[in-house]
Amino acid sequence: MLEISLWNPDEKGVLRRSSRIPDTIPGISRFQQVVLHQGRIERFFLDAINEFSEGKVSVERGVIPTSLEINEKTVEDADAYPITVNLRHLSEEEARPKQTATSVNGTVIQDGLFRSNLSPDDTAEMIKAAELNQKADTVEVVKAKYMLGADGAHSWVRKELGFKLEGESTDYIWGVLDIVPITDFPDIRMRCAIHSANSGSVMVIPRENKLVRLYIQLTTTEKIGDQDSRADRSWITPDVILESAQRIMAPYKLSYRKLDWWTAYQIGQRVGSSFSAHERVFLAGDAVHTHRFVSRSVFAFRPLTSYCAAPKLVRV
Protein backbone atom coordinates (compact mmCIF):
# COMPACT_ATOMS: atom_id res chain seq x y z
CA MET A 1 0.00 0.00 0.00
CA LEU A 2 1.59 3.25 -1.16
CA GLU A 3 -1.18 5.82 -0.74
CA ILE A 4 -4.29 6.55 1.30
CA SER A 5 -7.35 8.18 -0.23
CA LEU A 6 -9.36 10.40 2.09
CA TRP A 7 -13.04 10.87 1.30
CA ASN A 8 -15.18 13.51 2.98
CA PRO A 9 -18.47 15.33 2.28
CA ASP A 10 -18.18 18.59 0.36
CA GLU A 11 -20.05 21.79 1.23
CA LYS A 12 -23.24 20.21 -0.16
CA GLY A 13 -22.78 17.01 1.83
CA VAL A 14 -21.82 14.97 -1.24
CA LEU A 15 -19.03 12.44 -0.75
CA ARG A 16 -15.84 13.50 -2.56
CA ARG A 17 -12.19 12.52 -2.55
CA SER A 18 -10.64 15.32 -0.51
CA SER A 19 -7.01 14.22 -0.77
CA ARG A 20 -4.62 11.40 -1.52
CA ILE A 21 -1.54 11.14 0.68
CA PRO A 22 1.45 8.78 1.05
CA ASP A 23 0.71 5.77 3.25
CA THR A 24 3.96 6.38 5.14
CA ILE A 25 6.27 9.38 5.38
CA PRO A 26 8.50 9.27 2.28
CA GLY A 27 12.06 8.33 3.17
CA ILE A 28 11.30 7.22 6.73
CA SER A 29 12.12 3.58 5.94
CA ARG A 30 13.30 1.34 3.12
CA PHE A 31 10.22 -0.79 3.83
CA GLN A 32 6.63 -0.11 2.87
CA GLN A 33 3.38 -1.46 4.25
CA VAL A 34 1.88 -4.56 2.68
CA VAL A 35 -1.24 -6.61 3.39
CA LEU A 36 -0.64 -10.28 4.15
CA HIS A 37 -3.10 -13.05 5.03
CA GLN A 38 -2.93 -13.99 8.70
CA GLY A 39 -2.10 -17.57 7.73
CA ARG A 40 0.98 -16.38 5.82
CA ILE A 41 2.19 -14.37 8.82
CA GLU A 42 1.65 -17.34 11.14
CA ARG A 43 3.56 -19.54 8.69
CA PHE A 44 6.57 -17.21 8.88
CA PHE A 45 6.56 -17.45 12.67
CA LEU A 46 6.11 -21.23 12.67
CA ASP A 47 8.95 -21.74 10.21
CA ALA A 48 11.24 -19.44 12.20
CA ILE A 49 10.41 -21.24 15.46
CA ASN A 50 11.19 -24.58 13.86
CA GLU A 51 14.43 -23.32 12.32
CA PHE A 52 15.93 -21.55 15.32
CA SER A 53 14.87 -24.22 17.82
CA GLU A 54 16.20 -26.95 15.51
CA GLY A 55 12.80 -28.62 15.64
CA LYS A 56 12.64 -28.74 19.43
CA VAL A 57 9.82 -26.19 19.80
CA SER A 58 6.42 -26.44 18.14
CA VAL A 59 3.06 -24.71 18.44
CA GLU A 60 0.18 -26.90 19.60
CA ARG A 61 -3.41 -26.09 18.65
CA GLY A 62 -6.65 -27.33 20.13
CA VAL A 63 -5.25 -27.19 23.67
CA ILE A 64 -7.00 -25.40 26.53
CA PRO A 65 -5.75 -24.66 30.06
CA THR A 66 -8.02 -25.82 32.87
CA SER A 67 -6.12 -24.72 35.98
CA LEU A 68 -3.27 -22.44 37.00
CA GLU A 69 -1.42 -22.53 40.30
CA ILE A 70 1.53 -20.45 41.51
CA ASN A 71 3.63 -21.66 44.43
CA GLU A 72 4.27 -18.36 46.18
CA LYS A 73 6.87 -19.96 48.45
CA THR A 74 9.26 -20.55 45.56
CA VAL A 75 8.69 -17.54 43.29
CA GLU A 76 11.88 -15.87 44.56
CA ASP A 77 14.00 -18.93 43.74
CA ALA A 78 15.49 -18.39 40.26
CA ASP A 79 15.90 -22.14 39.73
CA ALA A 80 12.38 -23.09 40.82
CA TYR A 81 9.40 -23.99 38.66
CA PRO A 82 6.61 -22.39 40.71
CA ILE A 83 3.93 -22.46 38.00
CA THR A 84 1.70 -25.49 37.46
CA VAL A 85 -0.73 -25.50 34.53
CA ASN A 86 -3.11 -28.31 33.60
CA LEU A 87 -3.74 -28.56 29.86
CA ARG A 88 -6.49 -30.54 28.20
CA HIS A 89 -6.42 -31.48 24.51
CA LEU A 90 -9.68 -30.77 22.71
CA SER A 91 -11.30 -32.94 20.10
CA GLU A 92 -11.41 -31.60 16.56
CA GLU A 93 -15.10 -30.79 16.98
CA GLU A 94 -14.54 -28.85 20.21
CA ALA A 95 -11.60 -26.94 18.78
CA ARG A 96 -13.62 -25.74 15.79
CA PRO A 97 -15.00 -22.21 16.43
CA LYS A 98 -18.76 -21.99 16.72
CA GLN A 99 -20.32 -20.11 13.84
CA THR A 100 -23.57 -18.19 13.80
CA ALA A 101 -26.57 -19.47 11.88
CA THR A 102 -26.30 -16.63 9.37
CA SER A 103 -26.02 -17.85 5.79
CA VAL A 104 -25.90 -16.25 2.39
CA ASN A 105 -27.60 -18.08 -0.47
CA GLY A 106 -27.78 -21.18 1.71
CA THR A 107 -24.04 -21.21 2.44
CA VAL A 108 -22.81 -20.67 5.98
CA ILE A 109 -20.22 -17.89 6.05
CA GLN A 110 -17.27 -18.08 8.43
CA ASP A 111 -17.35 -15.32 11.02
CA GLY A 112 -15.16 -14.07 13.82
CA LEU A 113 -17.88 -13.41 16.38
CA PHE A 114 -16.62 -16.25 18.58
CA ARG A 115 -13.62 -14.04 19.53
CA SER A 116 -15.46 -10.74 19.37
CA ASN A 117 -16.06 -8.72 22.51
CA LEU A 118 -19.74 -8.73 21.52
CA SER A 119 -19.85 -12.44 22.33
CA PRO A 120 -19.90 -13.87 25.86
CA ASP A 121 -16.77 -15.60 27.11
CA ASP A 122 -17.29 -19.34 26.52
CA THR A 123 -14.01 -20.58 28.04
CA ALA A 124 -15.75 -22.23 31.01
CA GLU A 125 -18.12 -24.08 28.65
CA MET A 126 -15.20 -25.30 26.54
CA ILE A 127 -13.40 -26.59 29.64
CA LYS A 128 -16.52 -28.43 30.81
CA ALA A 129 -17.11 -29.90 27.36
CA ALA A 130 -13.51 -31.07 27.15
CA GLU A 131 -13.78 -32.79 30.52
CA LEU A 132 -16.89 -34.66 29.41
CA ASN A 133 -15.68 -35.60 25.93
CA GLN A 134 -13.97 -38.99 25.82
CA LYS A 135 -12.10 -38.00 22.67
CA ALA A 136 -10.39 -35.26 24.58
CA ASP A 137 -9.23 -37.11 27.66
CA THR A 138 -5.52 -36.36 27.19
CA VAL A 139 -4.30 -34.18 30.06
CA GLU A 140 -0.88 -32.59 30.49
CA VAL A 141 0.57 -31.14 33.68
CA VAL A 142 3.16 -28.49 32.86
CA LYS A 143 5.67 -27.10 35.35
CA ALA A 144 7.10 -23.76 34.29
CA LYS A 145 9.44 -21.05 35.46
CA TYR A 146 7.53 -18.39 33.56
CA MET A 147 4.24 -18.09 31.71
CA LEU A 148 3.07 -15.59 29.11
CA GLY A 149 -0.68 -15.09 28.70
CA ALA A 150 -1.47 -13.61 25.29
CA ASP A 151 -4.98 -15.04 25.05
CA GLY A 152 -6.98 -12.00 24.03
CA ALA A 153 -9.52 -9.68 25.63
CA HIS A 154 -11.40 -12.64 27.18
CA SER A 155 -8.07 -13.75 28.71
CA TRP A 156 -8.42 -16.89 30.84
CA VAL A 157 -4.98 -16.25 32.34
CA ARG A 158 -5.94 -12.74 33.45
CA LYS A 159 -9.09 -14.00 35.14
CA GLU A 160 -7.20 -16.81 36.90
CA LEU A 161 -4.83 -14.20 38.30
CA GLY A 162 -7.75 -12.07 39.49
CA PHE A 163 -6.80 -9.05 37.37
CA LYS A 164 -9.34 -6.80 35.67
CA LEU A 165 -9.40 -4.62 32.57
CA GLU A 166 -10.12 -1.06 33.65
CA GLY A 167 -11.54 1.55 31.31
CA GLU A 168 -14.66 1.83 29.21
CA SER A 169 -16.13 1.08 25.83
CA THR A 170 -17.12 3.70 23.32
CA ASP A 171 -20.67 3.91 22.03
CA TYR A 172 -19.76 2.55 18.61
CA ILE A 173 -19.93 -0.89 17.08
CA TRP A 174 -17.88 -1.71 14.00
CA GLY A 175 -18.61 -4.42 11.49
CA VAL A 176 -16.05 -6.10 9.25
CA LEU A 177 -16.65 -7.62 5.82
CA ASP A 178 -14.17 -9.48 3.61
CA ILE A 179 -15.81 -9.35 0.19
CA VAL A 180 -15.18 -9.48 -3.53
CA PRO A 181 -16.98 -6.19 -4.21
CA ILE A 182 -19.24 -5.03 -7.00
CA THR A 183 -19.09 -1.24 -6.92
CA ASP A 184 -18.60 1.97 -8.88
CA PHE A 185 -16.51 3.48 -6.07
CA PRO A 186 -13.28 4.48 -7.88
CA ASP A 187 -10.80 3.83 -5.04
CA ILE A 188 -12.02 0.39 -3.96
CA ARG A 189 -8.55 -1.12 -4.57
CA MET A 190 -6.83 1.54 -2.49
CA ARG A 191 -6.56 2.06 1.23
CA CYS A 192 -9.29 4.58 2.07
CA ALA A 193 -10.75 6.46 4.99
CA ILE A 194 -14.32 7.44 4.12
CA HIS A 195 -16.30 9.83 6.32
CA SER A 196 -19.92 10.58 5.47
CA ALA A 197 -21.92 13.60 6.55
CA ASN A 198 -24.36 11.76 8.83
CA SER A 199 -24.00 7.99 8.46
CA GLY A 200 -20.58 7.20 9.93
CA SER A 201 -17.28 6.03 8.50
CA VAL A 202 -15.77 3.20 6.46
CA MET A 203 -12.16 2.08 6.17
CA VAL A 204 -11.14 0.20 3.01
CA ILE A 205 -8.14 -2.16 2.88
CA PRO A 206 -7.43 -4.08 -0.36
CA ARG A 207 -6.57 -7.75 0.13
CA GLU A 208 -5.47 -10.79 -1.85
CA ASN A 209 -7.51 -12.69 -4.46
CA LYS A 210 -9.67 -9.66 -5.34
CA LEU A 211 -10.89 -9.40 -1.74
CA VAL A 212 -11.44 -6.09 0.02
CA ARG A 213 -11.79 -5.66 3.77
CA LEU A 214 -14.26 -3.03 4.95
CA TYR A 215 -14.37 -1.72 8.52
CA ILE A 216 -17.82 -0.18 8.88
CA GLN A 217 -19.22 1.99 11.65
CA LEU A 218 -22.64 0.63 12.57
CA THR A 219 -24.39 2.42 15.40
CA THR A 220 -24.34 3.63 18.97
CA THR A 221 -25.18 1.55 22.02
CA GLU A 222 -27.30 2.07 25.09
CA LYS A 223 -25.82 2.61 28.54
CA ILE A 224 -27.64 1.02 31.48
CA GLY A 225 -26.98 2.60 34.87
CA ASP A 226 -23.29 2.82 35.70
CA GLN A 227 -22.38 -0.08 33.41
CA ASP A 228 -20.38 0.32 30.23
CA SER A 229 -22.40 0.62 27.05
CA ARG A 230 -22.99 -2.82 25.63
CA ALA A 231 -24.48 -4.00 22.38
CA ASP A 232 -27.07 -6.58 21.48
CA ARG A 233 -25.32 -8.57 18.76
CA SER A 234 -28.42 -10.55 17.81
CA TRP A 235 -29.40 -7.99 15.18
CA ILE A 236 -25.93 -7.80 13.59
CA THR A 237 -25.72 -9.74 10.32
CA PRO A 238 -23.67 -9.35 7.12
CA ASP A 239 -26.69 -7.70 5.47
CA VAL A 240 -26.96 -5.12 8.26
CA ILE A 241 -23.25 -4.34 7.98
CA LEU A 242 -23.47 -4.05 4.19
CA GLU A 243 -26.47 -1.70 4.39
CA SER A 244 -24.51 0.56 6.74
CA ALA A 245 -21.63 0.65 4.26
CA GLN A 246 -24.02 1.47 1.42
CA ARG A 247 -25.42 4.46 3.33
CA ILE A 248 -21.96 5.75 4.18
CA MET A 249 -20.62 5.37 0.63
CA ALA A 250 -23.66 6.82 -1.17
CA PRO A 251 -24.09 7.98 -3.91
CA TYR A 252 -21.70 5.19 -4.93
CA LYS A 253 -23.17 1.69 -5.19
CA LEU A 254 -21.83 -1.29 -3.25
CA SER A 255 -22.68 -5.00 -3.25
CA TYR A 256 -20.57 -8.12 -3.51
CA ARG A 257 -20.01 -11.21 -5.60
CA LYS A 258 -18.60 -13.17 -2.66
CA LEU A 259 -18.65 -12.78 1.12
CA ASP A 260 -15.61 -14.56 2.53
CA TRP A 261 -15.74 -13.64 6.24
CA TRP A 262 -17.31 -11.17 8.64
CA THR A 263 -17.40 -10.09 12.26
CA ALA A 264 -18.44 -7.21 14.52
CA TYR A 265 -17.12 -5.75 17.74
CA GLN A 266 -17.46 -2.83 20.11
CA ILE A 267 -14.37 -0.67 20.38
CA GLY A 268 -13.01 0.42 23.72
CA GLN A 269 -9.88 1.37 25.56
CA ARG A 270 -8.88 -0.55 28.67
CA VAL A 271 -5.74 -1.50 30.55
CA GLY A 272 -5.13 -4.29 33.03
CA SER A 273 -5.00 -3.65 36.77
CA SER A 274 -1.62 -5.44 36.66
CA PHE A 275 0.65 -6.78 33.92
CA SER A 276 2.25 -9.64 35.90
CA ALA A 277 1.96 -11.86 38.96
CA HIS A 278 5.12 -12.27 41.05
CA GLU A 279 7.05 -11.40 37.87
CA ARG A 280 6.48 -15.01 36.87
CA VAL A 281 3.22 -14.86 34.91
CA PHE A 282 2.95 -12.04 32.39
CA LEU A 283 0.09 -10.73 30.28
CA ALA A 284 0.49 -9.37 26.76
CA GLY A 285 -1.58 -7.99 23.90
CA ASP A 286 -5.34 -7.65 24.27
CA ALA A 287 -5.18 -9.73 27.45
CA VAL A 288 -3.91 -6.63 29.24
CA HIS A 289 -4.59 -3.62 27.01
CA THR A 290 -7.26 -2.97 24.38
CA HIS A 291 -7.45 0.05 22.12
CA ARG A 292 -9.61 1.83 19.62
CA PHE A 293 -8.69 0.27 16.30
CA VAL A 294 -8.70 3.61 14.49
CA SER A 295 -5.32 4.44 15.97
CA ARG A 296 -2.50 3.27 13.72
CA SER A 297 -0.21 2.91 16.74
CA VAL A 298 -2.45 0.10 18.05
CA PHE A 299 -1.14 -2.33 15.45
CA ALA A 300 2.44 -1.50 16.37
CA PHE A 301 1.87 -1.47 20.14
CA ARG A 302 -0.09 -4.70 20.57
CA PRO A 303 2.83 -7.06 19.76
CA LEU A 304 5.46 -4.97 21.55
CA THR A 305 4.73 -6.39 25.00
CA SER A 306 5.38 -9.89 23.68
CA TYR A 307 8.44 -8.83 21.69
CA CYS A 308 9.94 -7.14 24.74
CA ALA A 309 9.25 -10.09 27.04
CA ALA A 310 10.34 -12.91 24.74
CA PRO A 311 14.12 -12.19 24.57
CA LYS A 312 14.24 -11.85 28.36
CA LEU A 313 12.34 -15.07 29.01
CA VAL A 314 14.52 -17.21 26.74
CA ARG A 315 17.62 -16.09 28.62
CA VAL A 316 16.52 -17.32 32.04
Segments from the language model and where they lie:
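Hydrophobic residues embedded in beta-strands of well-ordered beta-sheets
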Residues: 83, 210-212, 281-282
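Eukaryotic short linear interaction motifs
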Residues: 67-69, 75-76, 93-94, 156-157, ...
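Surface-exposed beta-strand-to-loop junctions
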Residues: 21-27, 212-222, 285
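Short, solvent-exposed loop/helix junctions and linker helices
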Residues: 35-39, 235, 300-303
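Conserved mid-domain beta->alpha element of the FAD-binding
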Residues: 45, 149, 259, 265-316
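Active-site-adjacent segment of FAD-dependent monooxygenases/related oxidoreductases
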Residues: 1-51, 55-56, 60-62, 66-82, ...
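Conserved FAD-binding catalytic core of PHBH/FMO-like flavoproteins
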Residues: 47, 51, 57, 120-133, ...
